[in-house]
Design a protein with these regions (language model features):
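Non-heme Fe(II)-dependent double-stranded beta-helix
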Residues: 1-15, 22-127
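Double-stranded beta-helix
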Residues: 132-138, 144-207
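Residue-level preference for the first positions of well-ordered beta-strands
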Residues: 18-20, 203
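Structured helix-beta-strand junction loops
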Residues: 15-16, 200
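Short acidic/polar capping segments at secondary-structure boundaries
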Residues: 98-106, 116-117, 143-150, 157-160
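Sequence-level detector for tyrosine residue identity
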Residues: 18, 71, 89-91, 108, ...
Length: 207
């Protein structure tokens, strides 16, 4: 069944902090995006090695830009974003967005974080606190081109500051990532899964 927008998408986004537009991309566009992403992966690994995790922004590299343009202008996606946020919100800026890549050799996971607060060095935290509920901030779209279960989220956490249970589990800010030094592939997999699942209230998304 093709994608159908519903009020549930709006409710999920504003209450949980995320919503899933299942089957919103046509197969032909997925194919085009996969092909250009294969080229992007090669470029990224030539520049940053086999463990590199992104190429960004896509508009600054020698890539076929048409699939990204088609993605940005896809009417059903443009409409869905406008309904969940506002008609003034847009996605697909090729001078900004990137392609996330799976590391080639060893498993890895990103540290638990709140966007900008925990991963932008020197950010004015008072400004971050003031913008916590600003609908124009902290939004992102993740477009999975393959079955993807690597994203973890704490539903509803976008509406509040850290809970006591979260601080007790991870007392340092920014939260450090897991220690993967010297571990085998299998040990890394186990360590990363344990790290992600131990955040209180965390759920794993399946895209």
């Amino acid at each position: 069944m093709a994608f159908q927008f519903s009020d549930q998408h709006i409710e999920d986004f504003h209450m949980l902090g995320y919503t899933v537009f299942g089957k919103i991309l046509p197969p032909s566009l997925i194919s085009d995006l996969r092909q250009v992403s294969n080229v992007a992966r090669k470029i990224a690994r030539e520049r940053g090695g086999p463990q590199v995790q992104r190429l960004q922004p896509v508009g600054h590299f020698d890539l076929d830009q048409q699939p990204f343009i088609d993605y940005a202008e896809l009417p059903v996606l443009v409409d869905a974003v406008a309904k969940v946020l506002t008609p003034d919100h847009h996605h697909g800026d090729r001078d900004d967005f990137g392609i996330l890549l799976e590391p080639a050799e060893m498993p890895y996971c990103t540290a638990w974080h709140r966007d900008w607060r925990d991963n932008i060095h020197g950010l004015n935290l008072e400004h971050w606190n003031q913008g916590l509920l600003d609908i124009n901030l902290f939004n992102q779209i993740n477009c999975a081109l393959y079955n993807d279960s690597c994203t973890w989220i704490v539903p509803g956490s976008h509406l509040r500051h850290d809970l006591r249970s979260e601080v007790e589990r991870f007392p340092d800010r920014p939260i450090p990532g897991p220690n993967l030094e010297g571990k085998t592939t299998e040990e890394r997999e186990y360590t990363c899964l344990t790290y992600c699942s131990r955040m209180p209230g965390a759920v794993q998304l399946h895209l």
